[in-house]
UniProtKB/Swiss-Prot annotation:
Listed PANTHER family: DIPEPTIDYL PEPTIDASE 10, ISOFORM B, PROTEASE FAMILY S9B,C DIPEPTIDYL-PEPTIDASE IV-RELATED
TM annotation in the entry: 95-115
Role description: Type IV dipeptidyl-peptidase which removes N-terminal dipeptides sequentially from polypeptides having unsubstituted N-termini provided that the penultimate residue is proline.
Active site residues per record: S760, D837, H870
Protein name from the UniProt record: Probable dipeptidyl-aminopeptidase B
Membrane topology label: Single-pass type II membrane protein
Record's keyword terms, sorted: Aminopeptidase, Glycoprotein, Hydrolase, Membrane, Protease, Serine protease, Signal-anchor, Transmembrane, Transmembrane helix, Vacuole
GO molecular function, one term: aminopeptidase activity
Source taxon at top rank: Eukaryota
C-alpha cells in the first residue's frame, strides 16, 4: 500500500495503488442497475483501450464471462409487509403496495430523464484558475454559459489525461551529460538511438548522436525478434533486449533476453544454453562487460567475453529468492522488481537472499481465467484455478532477508557480519546504496518500522559497522518509511569534498528535510534544508561539478510543489526561477543534473519543457508539450470550479478542496459527495490538474464534491501525520465527520443528501466513517475494495502504522469495521470488491458481510467482480464500478434512498 507522488487519481490510490493504466471499456451492464447505467452508457462510446486481466488470460469460457448479474435477494418474510387477515386483504394490500412502488419508480424515472436530458453549462474560466493559496476560496465560480456535460466514459477513460512525455536520460560512454535514449516513431529513422537533449528532434548533426539499433527487429537463428524493452550498456556498445514479456505482480515480469551488438547489428541469447529460459531480472555491470540476472529464483552472471553463464546461487526455488524481491518486498519495500546492486567499479554484486519458508500462503481463486499455458488435469476443467501467494499478514512470520555479496574476479559469494544489527525475524532491509571502493550503505528497520539503522559495509575488507541508529518512537512516536532516493556523494577534493558521503532525508524539528552525511561514518549531518515545510522524494538530482542539490518541496504550501536548489554546504537555497508561486511541479534530471525535464502539472493546463539547470550556463529551453488539445477540450465542456481552503478540527488545519458545479447558485441546495483516500502519508488535496469521476459528479450530476485530507495524511508535518499511529481510522473518520457537519451548515448544502466514497484505504475510511457516524451526518456511502480488519492486510504496511497485533490488540479491534448496528443506521451503503484481489483480499469484505448477516442488517448493496484484482478491470469491471457509483448517486441526488433504504441487500455476484 505504497502512496506518494506516483498516485495521480484519487480513487486509484489503493493500499497498493492500482496502476494508472487505461481500463477496458464495458459493453454490458448489471441487470440490477440497467435502468440507469445504460442511459449513460448508451449515449457515450468509450475511448478506453483494452487491457488484459492481471497476469491471466481468459481460458475457455462462455458468454457468462462477459456479463455481470445483480441477484436481487427477495427472502422477505410475508408477515413483514402483508397483514395475515385473509387472501383478499393480502391481494388488495399487494396491489396497493406495487402501485405505490410503480408511482415512486415512475416519478423517479421522469425526474431522472429530465435531469440527464437537461442542457449542460459551460464555464469559460479554467477549472483551476485563480489564486492558489491553501487558505480561503481561490477559484472563481463557473460563469454561466452553454456547454457540454462531461460523459462518464470520458471522465474515467483517459480522454482528459494530459499528454505527457517520458524522458529516458542516459550517460554518455565518456560521462557526457544531457543525453537521451530515443525510439523512432512511425518507422522513420533508426529504431533506437542516443541523442543530445539539445537536438531532441534529431534535425541537426550532433557529435553525441549514436545509432544503437537500426531496425526494430533482428534475427537469431532465423527467428524474428522484436524487442519490447531495451537497456543499453554504459559504454553504449551492447543493448540488452527483452521479448515475450509476462507480467507477474505490480512491478515484476519475466521475459526472454538477448544481447545485441551495436557494431555488427547482430544478437545472441543472454544465455546461449537456455535461450528460452524466462528471466526475472537482468542488470548491467557498470563496466559493461557482464550482466547479472535471475532465473527460476537463482542468480547468474554472464561475462560478455564468454558465451558461458555461471551460477552464483543454486538453491533458489519456491521459498528462496536471490536478487529479486518476494511479493511483500516488491509491493511495500522496494516498489520494484530489483534486489541486485552492482558496486560502482563492477567488482562486486550485492544481492538479497529472501527466505519465505515460514510465510503462510493465501489462495486466490480464478473462476474465469488462468495463467498462459496452464492446462487443467482431465475432468478438472470445471474447477477454479487456485494461485497460492506467500502473503505475510499482520503478526504472521515475515520473509527473512540477508544481504549477500559476490566477488566477480574471485567468483565467490560471501556475507559480512555486522554487530548490533537487528535479528532476522525482526529485520527489514529497506535500502541498499552502492558506493565507491567496495563501500555499500545498507538501511534496515525493525518490522514495526520505528528502529532505523544504517550500516556501512566494506566489501574489500569484508567488514562493516552500524554508523547511525535512531528510535523514531522516541523522537515523535511515529514511524519511518522505506526510502528510494538516498544519494551517494563520492569524494572529490578538487571540488571541496574530501570524503565520501551521502544525502538522506531525516526528521528535523517535526518535518522531513535534506541532510548531508560526510564522511560516511559521521552520524551527525549537515542540514541542507530546515523549516516548517517538507522535501518530497528528495533529492531529485545532484550536480557534482558545482556541488548543487536539486529537490522538490512544499515550501510555498503543503498542496503546492516547486523545484528548489541548495549548495552542499547548506547555502543558497532558492526556488527555480520563473516558477508560478502557486503551482504543482515535478521534475526529472539528467544524470549530471545539467538538464531537466520540468513538468507543470497544475492547476492550469499542464505543460512540459526541457531546460538547462541553473548551475548550467547553457541557457537551453525547449517546449516539449503544451497540451493544446486539452486546453481546447476544457473550453468546450462545463467544468466545476475548485475552491481550496482549510478547516480547523481539534486545532489542526485540514486541507480541503471543494468542487462546485458549473453555474453554481448559492441560493440553491446541493447534494454533497465526500471523496477520500486518507492513507498515512498520502495526499489527495493538491494543485494538480485532474479531471476524473469527481469532476464528472460535480459537472454532470450537479453535486458539490469535497475532499478533505485529514490527520494522518502527508506533507503537513510529523505531528499531523503520526497522530494516527496504533489507531488507524479513528482520527481520520472523526475529521471527515466534522468536515461534513461544517459543510452541512452551509446555506447551499442539502444536509439530507450527503454521501461519501473511497477505494482501498479510502474504502476502509468510507466504512469507518459510516460506522462512527451511525447515520447522523452521512446518508450514503460507497466502499471499493476496502480493508475491514487490519489483521488481514500485509505485515510490512500494517505494522508500520499499527505495530504487531500481539503488541496492540485494542488498536486492531478499534480499527476494524465491526459495529454492524451503527452501519445499519445509515440510509444505505454499497460495497464492491474483486474476487481475485491479491492485495486487499476478498476475505475483508466477506467477513464484514458475515457481521451484517448475523445482525440482520439489510441496508446495503454488494457487487463482486469475478477474477478482478485490486484495480478491478477484468472483463470491463472498472467501468462497472463507476457506473454503480453513478447509479447510486443519481438515486441519492433525487432523494430516493429514503424509499430504497427499506429494500433488502442487492448482491451482485
Amino acid at each position: 500500500m505504497r502512496v506518494g507522488s506516483r498516485i495521480n487519481d484519487e480513487e486509484a490510490m489503493p493500499l497498493t495503488a492500482p496502476e494508472s493504466r487505461a481500463r477496458d471499456s464495458i459493453d454490458s451492464s448489471s441487470t440490477a442497475s440497467i435502468s440507469l447505467t445504460l442511459v449513460e452508457g448508451a449515449s457515450h462510446a468509450t475511448t478506453e483501450p483494452s487491457k488484459p486481466a492481471h497476469n491471466h488470460n481468459g481460458r475457455a469460457q462462455g458468454n457468462y464471462a462477459e456479463k455481470y448479474r445483480d441477484d436481487l435477494e427477495e427472502d422477505w418474510e410475508e408477515d413483514n409487509y402483508i397483514p395475515s387477515n385473509g387472501k383478499s386483504n393480502q391481494r388488495r394490500t399487494l396491489i396497493v403496495f406495487w402501485l405505490l412502488v410503480a408511482l415512486c419508480v415512475g416519478g423517479w424515472a421522469v425526474a431522472f430523464l429530465f435531469f440527464v436530458t437537461s442542457p449542460g453549462n459551460k464555464t469559460s474560466t479554467s477549472p483551476h484558475s485563480g489564486s492558489n493559496s491553501p487558505e480561503g476560496d481561490v477559484t472563481k465560480p463557473g460563469i454561466p454559459a452553454t456547454g457540454k456535460k462531461i460523459p462518464l466514459d470520458d471522465a474515467i477513460g483517459g480522454v482528459w489525461s494530459p499528454a505527457e512525455h517520458t524522458i529516458s536520460w542516459i550517460t554518455g560512454a565518456k560521462g557526457e551529460d544531457g543525453l537521451l535514449l530515443q525510439k523512432s516513431e512511425g518507422g522513420t529513422g533508426p529504431y533506437l538511438h542516443v541523442e543530445d537533449v539539445r537536438n531532441i528532434h534529431g534535425t541537426q548533426s550532433n557529435n553525441n548522436s549514436i545509432v544503437l539499433m537500426k531496425e526494430s527487429v533482428f534475427f537469431v537463428n532465423d527467428e524474428r525478434i522484436s524487442p519490447e524493452k531495451v537497456w543499453p550498456s554504459p559504454d553504449l556498445k551492447t543493448v540488452l533486449a527483452m521479448t515475450r514479456e509476462k507480467k507477474n505482480w505490480r512491478h515484476s515480469f519475466t521475459g526472454l533476453y538477448w544481447l545485441f551488438d551495436v557494431e555488427t547489428q547482430t544478437a545472441q541469447p543472454l544465455d546461449p544454453d537456455a535461450p528460452n529460459g524466462r528471466i526475472q531480472l537482468a542488470t548491467w555491470s557498470p563496466t559493461s562487460d557482464a550482466v547479472a540476472f535471475t532465473r527460476d529464483n537463482n542468480l547468474y552472471i554472464r561475462n560478455l567475453t564468454s558465451k558461458s553463464v555461471k551460477a552464483i546461487t543454486t538453491d533458489g526455488g519456491t521459498n528462496l529468492f536471490y536478487g529479486i524481491p518476494d511479493w511483500v518486498y516488491e509491493e511495500e519495500v522496494f516498489e520494484g522488481n530489483c534486489a541486485t546492486w552492482w558496486s560502482l567499479d563492477g567488482k562486486y554484486i550485492s544481492y538479497l537472499r529472501t527466505n519465505e519458508t515460514l510465510v503462510p500462503e493465501f489462495p486466490i481463486d480464478f473462476y474465469l481465467s488462468s495463467p498462459p499455458g496452464y492446462s487443467p488435469k482431465p475432468n478438472e476443467e470445471s474447477y477454479p484455478y487456485v494461485q497460492q501467494i506467500k502473503y505475510p499478514k499482520a503478526g504472521a512470520p515475515n520473509p527473512t532477508v540477508n544481504l549477500q555479496f559476490y566477488d566477480v574476479e574471485r567468483e565467490e559469494s560471501f556475507s559480512v557480519d555486522v554487530k548490533d544489527t537487528l535479528k532476522d525475524d525482526d529485520r527489514l532491509i529497506v535500502e541498499v546504496i552502492p558506493g565507491s571502493k567496495g563501500k555499500v550503505l545498507v538501511r534496515e528497520t525493525n518490522r514495526e518500522s520505528y528502529i532505523v539503522k544504517v550500516a556501512v559495509i566494506d566489501a574489500n575488507k569484508r567488514e562493516g559497522k552500524i554508523v547511525r541508529s535512531d528510535n523514531i518512537d522516541e523522537i515523535d512516536g511515529g514511524w519511518v518509511e522505506p526510502s528510494h532516493t538516498t544519494t551517494y556523494i563520492p569524494a572529490d577534493p578538487s571540488a571541496g569534498r574530501p570524503d565520501d558521503g551521502y544525502i538522506d532525508t531525516v526528521i528535523h524539528e517535526g518535518y522531513i528535510h535534506l541532510a548531508y552525511f560526510t564522511p560516511l561514518e559521521n552520524p551527525k549531518p549537515k542540514m541542507l534544508t530546515t523549516g516548517k515545510w517538507e522535501v518530497v522524494a528528495a533529492p531529485s538530482g545532484v550536480d557534482l561539478k558545482n556541488n548543487v542539490v536539486y529537490f522538490v518541496a512544499t515550501k510555498e504550501s503543503p498542496i503546492d510543489r516547486h523545484v528548489y536548489s541548495v549548495k552542499l554546504d547548506g547555502s543558497e537555497l532558492q526556488m527555480l526561477k520563473d516558477s508560478d508561486k502557486s503551482a504543482y511541479y515535478d521534475v526529472s534530471f539528467s544524470h549530471g543534473a545539467g538538464y531537466m525535464l520540468l513538468k507543470y502539472q497544475g492547476p492550469q493546463i499542464p505543460w512540459q519543457k526541457l531546460i538547462s539547470s541553473p548551475s548550467n550556463a547553457d541557457n537551453y529551453i525547449e517546449i516539449l508539450e503544451e497540451n493544446k488539445k486539452l486546453a481546447k477540450l476544457s473550453n468546450e465542456f462545463s467544468l466545476p470550479s475548485l475552491h481550496y481552503s482549510t478547516i480547523n478540527v481539534d486545532g489542526f488545519e485540514l486541507p480541503v478542496v471543494e468542487r462546485r458545479p458549473p453555474n453554481f447558485d448559492e441560493t440553491k441546495k446541493y447534494p454533497v459527495l465526500f471523496q477520500l483516500y486518507g492513507g498515512p502519508g498520502s495526499q489527495t488535496v493538491n494543485k494538480k490538474f485532474l479531471v476524473n469521476f469527481q469532476t464528472y459528479v460535480a459537472s454532470s450530476l450537479g453535486y458539490i464534491v469535497v475532499t478533505v485530507d485529514g490527520r494522518g495524511t502527508g506533507f503537513n508535518g510529523r505531528k499531523f501525520k503520526c497522530i494516527v499511529r496504533r489507531n488507524l481510522g479513528h482520527y481520520e473518520s472523526h475529521d471527515q465527520i466534522q468536515a461534513a457537519k461544517a459543510w452541512g451548515k452551509k446555506p447551499y448544502v442539502d444536509k439530507t443528501r450527503m454521501a461519501i466514497w473511497g477505494w482501498s484505504y479510502g474504502g476502509f475510511m468510507t466504512l469507518k466513517t459510516l460506522e462512527q457516524d451511525a447515520g447522523e451526518t452521512f446518508q450514503y456511502g460507497m466502499a471499493v475494495a476496502p480493508v475491514t480488519n487490519w489483521r488481514y492486510y500485509d505485515s510490512v504496511y500494517t505494522e508500520r502504522y499499527m505495530h504487531m497485533p500481539q503488541n496492540n490488540e485494542g488498536g486492531y479491534e478499534n480499527a476494524s469495521i465491526s459495529n454492524a448496528t451503527n452501519l445499519s443506521q445509515n440510509t444505505r451503503f454499497l460495497i464492491m470488491h474483486g474476487s481475485a484481489d491479491d492485495n486487499v483480499h476478498f476475505q475483508n469484505t466477506l467477513t464484514l458481510l458475515d457481521k451484517l448477516d448475523i445482525l440482520g442488517v439489510h441496508n446495503y448493496d454488494m457487487h463482486v467482480f469475478p477474477d478482478s484484482n485490486h484495480g478491478i478491470y477484468f472483463h470491463h469491471a472498472y467501468k462497472m464500478v463507476h457506473q454503480r457509483k453513478y447509479f447510486n448517486l443519481s438515486f441519492l441526488g433525487h432523494g430516493f434512498f429514503s424509499f430504497y433504504s427499506n429494500f433488502l441487500p442487492i448482491r451482485s455476484f
